[in-house]
A protein has these predicted regions:
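ABC transporter nucleotide-binding domain
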Residues: 172-254
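Catalytic Walker B motif of ABC-type/P-loop ATPase nucleotide-binding domains
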Residues: 153-157
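Conserved ABC transporter NBD signature motif
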Residues: 56-67, 71-72
Length: 296
């Protein structure tokens, strides 16, 4: 269980975090989103024990992270947004270096490294890290965060700047880690991935938490069910002069409605113009649309 109460962080008069409280369970993926400067990285560093909050409490599995951040280290895997790799080292030596820091034996390092290379589809072949693509470097950084088999992971922009295939691979791997029982806290600008893989999501705005919950809860709180009416019509000119606007999609005309009243208005106008409603789709706004709405 991870519990935070009234976390604040003041940097020389700038309030980077302002009274943030939340709670989520072990074995969940918890996403933190917000515009640039919202406080995401600051919160991740506090959760990781890298910086102390100005005030507030944080408990991770009964560890008081504020008073005893070192107690978290051996069970924490941290991935910063910019992972500075030792580019003259091979991936094998890089993982061995960190494995030794965590007290693993040479045999344990070799076994664990091979497991991670296989899981992450990495074939280092003795190449230096400076020769790796950005995607391979990010996978290596993730392997480094997992070398000591931690159960609690904090990832800052795990897929930032990667091509779609690498980004998708890492998102799928995070799902695998969850199935293995890992607890994951992450920030991301790829909101479609956050929506797809996170159990709970927090939205930060200027250091304040403005939303927290499952996607279902966020939709109920901030989302409005909208409708798309797909219709066919022989004489498109009959639509001219109506108060609604139309677009074309899938070979049909589409009228968008943001309420049941607008839905009834659209279907009535379509009927008056001699059109035929073929189907009606309904949906809640995406996480990206909610963030834009909340951020205004």
């Amino acid at each position: 269980m991870i519990k935070a109460r009234n976390l604040t962080k003041n940097f020389d008069g700038f309030m980077a975090l302002d009274g943030v409280s939340f709670e989520f369970d072990d074995g969940e993926i918890f996403g933190i989103i917000g515009h640039n400067g919202a406080g995401k990285t600051t919160l991740l560093k506090i959760i990781s024990g890298l910086i102390a909050p100005t005030s507030g409490e944080l408990f991770i599995n009964d560890i008081d992270v504020v008073k005893n951040p070192v107690a978290l280290k051996e069970n924490l895997g941290y991935l910063p947004e910019e992972s500075r790799l030792y580019e003259t080292m091979t991936a094998e030596n890089y993982l061995a270096f960190f494995g030794e820091i965590y007290g693993l034996s040479p045999k344990e390092i070799r076994i664990r490294s091979n497991q991670l290379f296989a899981a992450l589809s990495l074939e280092p072949d003795g190449k230096k890290l400076g020769e790796f693509s950005k995607g391979m470097k990010r996978k290596t950084a993730i392997a480094r965060s997992l070398i000591h088999e931690p159960s609690f992971l904090v990832y800052d922009e795990a897929t930032s700047g990667l091509d779609p295939m690498s980004s998708r691979f890492i998102a799928d791997y995070l799902r695998t880690l969850k199935k293995e029982g890992k607890t994951i806290v992450l920030s991301a600008h790829n909101l479609y991935q956050v929506e797809a893989i996170c159990d709970k999501v927090m939205i930060l705005k200027r250091g304040k938490m403005v939303a927290f919950g499952t996607m279902k809860e966020l939709r109920e709180q901030f989302g409005t069910l909208t409708y798309a009416i797909f219709f066919s019509i022989k004489d498109a000119g009959a639509l001219i002069g109506h108060s609604r606007t139309y677009r074309q999609e899938e070979g049909l005309f589409v009228c968008d409605a943001e309420s049941m009243a607008e839905l009834n208005e659209c279907t009535g106008l379509i009927g008056e113009a001699g059109g035929k409603v073929e189907k009606i789709d309904s949906r809640y706004p995406s996480l990206e649309e909610m963030l834009v709405k909340i951020g205004k």
